[in-house]
Amino acid sequence: MISKKLSLILLAVVFVIEGVSLFWIRGDYRSTMLDGAEYEVPASIDFKGDFYGRNYLPIYIPLTEAPWKGTATPEKGEEIYLSFDKNGEGLLEITGASDRKPGGMYIITRVVSASDGLVHFRFPADRMYMLPEQLKKLSVVELSERVQLKDKSGKKTETRMKNDLTALIHIKDGRVVISKVLANGSPVEQTYTTVGKNLSVKYA
């Protein structure tokens, strides 16, 4: 009888802890979305798995390594701080990583691996939440289409994504959330046609 009561108490404690954690996570998400500084980053959409059976759009942001500017080489799983700036195209780029909190804006993430003066990590935002009915309207064919283009020399042909995808992110106190995904500068939820850019292309 005592064991059963103890089990129920422990179960209740677990539910309370999970509820409090979820409350804080949602609070951080809302705070970052509303008050965070906005930046644009390169992005791609992950169409694998049950794409339409979710309430979010899975996003890959290819910012995954930086020069290590900290003290000792970090261990896998260690929390680190990323410094960043805007490149010539106005997109956010990671300029360094450290175990010490930098002045100004920064991003918090964890180490995947480190070697030869570089640290590798996962970008700490990988989804944009959407209503299921919005998600079902997205044109997978349009957003995943690839085309063949001549390079700058005009001698070689390269296969690239037809649409130029980027994401708008908000950053606050090291936390990051994705607010929008853009296809050629327009929100993906408004991209339902196969017009794309005005380019001379050959379909791959």
What are the residue ranges of the model-derived segments?
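A mature extracytoplasmic/lumenal domain signature
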Residues: 45, 55, 63, 86-88, ...
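Alpha-helical transmembrane signal-anchor/signal-peptide segments
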Residues: 28-44
